[in-house]
Each structure stands twice: as C-alpha cells, then as structure tokens.
Amino acid sequence: MIELSRRRFLGAAGAGVVLPFVGRFLGPPAFPPERSFRIRAVTAGIPLSGDAGPRELEPALGFLRQARAELEAGGYEVQTVRLATQPLAEYLPDWSSREALEVIREMDEIALAADASLSLGPVITADEHVPEFASWAAELVRRTRNVSFSVRVASREHGIHRSALRSAAEAIAALGRESPGGEGNFRFAAAAFVPSGTPFFPSAWFSEPRTFSIGLESPVLLEEILSGVSGPAAARGALAAGLEAVLGDVERAAVEIGRETGWRFLGIDSSPAPGLDASIGRVIERLTGTPFGDPTTLAACALLTDVMKALTVTTCGYSGLMLPVLEDPVLAERAREGRYGVSDLLLYSSVCGTGLDVVPVPGDTPVDRIGGLVEDVAALALRYEKPLSARLLPMPGRKAGEVVRFDNPYLTDGVVMEAG
C-alpha cells in the first residue's frame, strides 16, 4: 500500500525546478498480483450547513474509513479517500473573509488527520468577476495543505462565463507566482459542465448528502486487455467486455458498501486515470502503433472514450479519457520530443476529457493568454455539453522548452510547453 496519500503529497510537497532531463524507467507496475488497477479515489459527498465544522465532517470520515477497509479486504488497493462539498458560497456566503478561511483551515486539518483530502467545490458559480479571488486563492493554498477548489466557467443557461473566466485566469497566474514552484495550481481548476458526484479532484463537488463515488487508475488493465488484440474493431470489443467484467465487480462491491452503511453509491468514473506506472499514453500507442501525437492519436482517443461512455455499469463524473501531461511518463516524454502541443491537447479534448490537465506553461504567460486557453476549454465543453476543465501550471521563471523535474513520487519530469 502507498502510505502517503496522493493528494496529501500534492498539497504538501514538490516544487518544480529546472534540471537536466532524466528519463524514467517504466518498470513493472506495483499492483497487487490479483488486480491490474487501483481505486484512485473513494469520494464522499458532504453538503454542509452554514455552521460548517468538525461535527459535519465526522460521519463522512467514518464512512470513508469503513468503505476503505471493506474494499481493501476485498483485495482492492485504495489510493485515496476524499470529501467533496457543495459549492462553497452555499455554506460560507462570506467565503473571502478571514473567518471563513479559518473555518476552511480547520476542516483541512480534520480531513488531513484522517488521511483524507477535501474539495470545496466551485467557489464562483455565476458569471461574475471577483477581483479579490486571485489573492484569496493564493492565501487559501498557503493556509491549507489538502484543499482543492474550482471556478465554473460555462453553463447551459449562460454559455461561457467570461467574467468568471477572468477570475480563474487571474488565480492561475497568482498561484503560479506565489506558491512554491507554482505547485498551488495542482489544487485549482477552471471547470465547465463538471457534474455533481464527480470523484476526481480538483473539480469534485456534491449536491446530495450521504452519497459517494469511485474513480479508478486503470491503464495497466487496458494494456492487459489489449494484449494480442489487433485492429480497432477487435480492440473496441475486447475493451468493452473486459471493462464491463472488472468494473461490474467494483460496482457490486460499492453497492454492498452502500447497503451496509446507508450511503448511496452514485457510480464509477470510468476514466482510466494514469500514474507513473500506469500510462494512458502507452495504451494509446499500443492502439496506434505510433508515438503519441502522431496521426491516429485522435482516433485512438475517440475509441477509448466511446468505450468508456458505452459501459452499462453505473458511471459518473468525466467517464472519458484523461491526458494529464505531468502525471504520465509517456505523455511527458512525447511533449519533450515536440510531438504535440497545447493546441493538440485541445483537439484531443474534442473527443475526450478532461481538457488541459496538469499542463506546464511558461511562468510569464500573461493573464489574457491563460484566459484564452481556459475560454477554449469552456467553448469545447459548451459545444459538446460535456465535462472539461483546465489545470494549467505556470512555472515560475521558466520558459518554453525548459525541463522541469518535480521532487514528487507522483509526477514525472516534463518540459514547459508553449501556452497555445
């Protein structure tokens, strides 16, 4: 088992520094012998009242302890447990005050003590520019270790939220400047059409009490399913059958946990979230027979997304394809080789998700440029009415083409990419 939780580490460690590029050896995955995937997250929904405090977190933390124990007893590796609230302003209307920040800090400490992480949901949900949001975001990251949050940048009712989008871009720039190595942006996203019940951070939020969802880390499973398979049609059929069987088992275990605890299971986010020993880039290259970024990459992304969307198990959240550049050694290496750029990631987002995820950009990228990238993500989400988000990482003092290395077991060496 991994003793230090993924989100706990991301919140507390690892500034990026420039070093000579060090390629990473992709050794055998450290998965339990009977499983070729991990449960990345069990996320519990805790809509809070205006008196947010310890007594409201404890029932959810107790549920997460039990859920984790039962899943582990069933042979599953549970990497993290998480709490997600409704949009912050619904329970802390004066969210930018020092008093509200102190409440959030206390909740962070309570969650941290239970080895859980906390998402505040979207802080800004309306289409409004909040000038103080950027400084508030930087202060929040300074005062907490495990708290994630987002801004809603598009909706069916109002289209692209260009004013809120400006607030998000200013926050991304501020976090890049004011958090060590720009690492504060790991905990923030500009999000569009991300539904309630999503287990993955930093965009997770919940609207219903006593509910939970599950997210997976499953590229190694996909590789196993594709072993010996040739051609798109055969790959599609093998993936569908293999995932239905495996995710069906997870669903049955989760439903049983819900029955025992009284917490309602919302579904599995079927997105095959990658890790350093579980590369989705490698899966795509197995499908195409060419390096990621070459022609047919888009077609492979579409195939994988189609399979995820067509599963008959109960799904939730993104349930598409994640391409987080700094969390996947193959994606990071192909970026270093110049095989794809930010515009290509936007193109791939038209057939998959989650948008622009963990993308390192120059530290001096102007706010307007950041906002333009976020607006492109919002436009795609609006056009296709699907969840997408932007988690951009301006690297302080770094320029495009420079290599960054993170002192962090969950991130790989990467190259700073041109911001569009």
Question: Where are these predicted regions, by residue range?
Answer:
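Anaerobic metallocofactor- and corrinoid-dependent redox/one-carbon enzyme cores
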Residues: F31-G420
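C-terminal segment of N-terminal export signals and the immediately downstream linker at the start
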Residues: I2-L4, F21-R35
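N-terminal secretory signal peptides and thylakoid transit peptides that target proteins
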Residues: M1-P20
